[in-house]
Swiss-Prot record:
Pfam families: Fimbrial (PF00419). Disulfide bonds join 41-81. This is Major fimbrial subunit. The keyword Signal applies.
Length: 213
């Protein structure tokens, strides 16, 4: 019994020493922050899986990198967004929008547009799809696995910024008002040249979730 106890104490002491000897230059820690709000918006059923068809366009319209063509409007409608809650206003959002993301086809090198996923023999080359806010002038940077806007440096274990970054990737952000039954969020999709385009088919897709501010 004494030998067993002694062995256990030695093992615990050894384990403590191992933890104390972790090299701080080769290790670290990530702390995550977030918030759950009272709001209960839902995506309108018929808008959960949309198809948007852009008109055909001549390849000369996309002959140079960053050329865009055929801006095409589309709408995603939310429902049941009344911000009035029985639990007070402490955790009630003021605005709602959409968070567009894709882990497979975001093109970081071309302004976080969406790569052409068409795999048939007659697919267009050097053509992506770009999303825009409804004003037609502000591009939407779709979130991909290389997006870094959400990270902040910690200082001695304390996050320097525990709020959303200035660019929280919430698109179509709209003020929530009492009595709102349906809330349409408007966007634009357009062709985007990553170089001189060749003729062929274009297809891409993006996921989205409701996001609050």
């Amino acid at each position: 019994m004494k030998k067993t106890l002694l062995g256990s104490l030695i093992l615990l002491a050894f384990a403590g020493n191992v933890q104390a000897d972790i090299n701080t230059e080769t290790s670290g820690k990530v702390t995550f922050f977030g918030k759950v709000v009272e709001n209960t918006c839902k995506v309108k059923t018929e808008h959960k899986n949309l198809s948007v068809v852009l008109n055909d366009v001549g390849k000369n319209s996309l002959s140079t990198k960053v050329n865009t063509a055929m801006p095409t409007p589309f709408t995603i409608t939310l429902q049941n967004c009344d911000p009035t809650t029985a639990n007070g206003t402490a955790n009630k959002a003021n605005k709602v929008g959409l968070y567009f993301y894709s882990w497979k086809n975001v093109d970081k090198e071309n302004n976080f547009t969406l790569k052409n996923e068409q795999t048939t023999a007659d697919y267009a080359t050097n053509v992506n799809i770009q999303l825009m806010e409804s004003n037609g002038t502000k591009a939407i940077s779709v979130v991909g696995k290389e997006t870094e806007d959400f990270m902040h440096t910690n200082n001695n274990g304390v996050a320097l910024n525990q709020t959303h970054p200035n660019n929280a990737h919430i698109s179509g952000s709209t003020q929530l008002t009492t009595g709102t039954n349906e809330l349409p969020l408007h966007f634009i999709a357009q062709y985007y040249a990553t170089n001189k385009a060749t003729a062929g088919k274009v297809q891409s897709s993006v996921d989205f979730q409701i996001a609050y501010e």
